Amino acid sequence: MEETPIKRTVLDYDDIRKMVPFFDGKKRLVNFLLKLLSVDKVNWIHDHNCDTPGVPFTAGLLNDLNITLRIDNEERLDNLPEGSFITVSNHPLGALDGIALIKIVGERRPKFKVMVNMVLNYISAMRPNFIAVDALASNDPKKKAVSMQGIKAAMMQVRAGEPMGFFPAGAVSKLNTRFHIDDREWQPTIIRLIKQMKVPVVPIYFHSRNSWWFTFLGIVSWKLRTLRLPAEVFRKKNATIHISIGETIPAEEIEKFDDLKLLGDYLKQKTYDMRTLK
């Protein structure tokens, strides 16, 4: 199958008017909104780096933002399992954590892919390392079909002997009842897929978080929170993202779990155990 050409912008007027017909013919208004939401900055960085898609793109993006990655137990990345394996991670940032994950694993295994929400699939320079699914698939047969294709693609990736990354929460972290930023329950669909894959699992924890304003918007509406995501990316300019790499969990250990809820809790706990690392 012929690959779709890389689009130089992430989101522009033509995309918006197709999504929301109300904006058709209102190019100046759309461009104003794109600037207000920092999408114009995202478009610039994408255009600046999209000629080197995939893993090199992640390095260029992080370099343009002057973001440093501080990695605990980095030697574990140099001793990843041969053949197929899975990474599981918390999802506090919604975009930069996926980009950082692809950089640190993809530099060792260039064919590494990460399952992401359809929103991130607009970053066309990242599609070589993305498998996109739709979080709202249950409400729309067409979206459900896209997500099923994504699940099949993930299974084929592992069967081909390549690594696969998951953010099992399926959405960016949010405020819990104890006023901590935390993933929601890791999704049974992803946990079932991990169990079916029967390969080692590497937990990876991201210590960063988005702004309190982003968190508040998530309480009001996930759509408002999504609109804020580009600005959150640029809020991390000149920052350090702290990442911890956990010990590889053997496939045999995963096989011991018959209950998906218990397996999900176990994998999440193994990931969040690294929260205390400073």
Per-range role (PLM):
Residues 103-106, 182-184:
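Glycine-rich, phosphate-binding/catalytic loops in enzymes
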